[in-house]
């Protein structure tokens, strides 16, 4: 019961794919930790999400969570930016994933790349509390490609790198063939 209450109050999930949202909720129900706070939104477009109903649900959920926490360091707004202690994310990456130009333009890092995995780094940074932690799956190209040096420099300016874990090529879908790492910031 304690785990379920904690999950309902403190754990949030956002996904652009409505089927993955449903799968996550079902997984939570089966694990016995509730099914609240899983939303179908484009994480890169916060706070201008297309579905105003989802945005209102998120605002209400954050407000409920803040009311229960009684966190005196928190400014008690329903804006999600700066509210998360930890973020765990596996952003979409690959040639098929495109970000609309008007969304990409919101991000400083779009000067260097409009790839969603690059923009997710900055989007998550904006959602974290000062001192918050993040674990993000990234293609190794970001970590070693000479063209992404400005992105790595931005990461170093804004985060402390805690660990980088190489993942097996088979870690995700078979035959995807993208070498990736789990970066702890």
Per-region residue spans from a language model:
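SAM-dependent methyltransferase catalytic region
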Residues: 1-157, 161
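AMP-binding (ANL) adenylation modules
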Residues: 170-176
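A short, structural micro-pattern
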Residues: 5, 176-179
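Conserved S-adenosyl-L-methionine
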Residues: 160-170
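Conserved beta strand-loop-helix elements of the APE1-like EEP
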Residues: 179-185
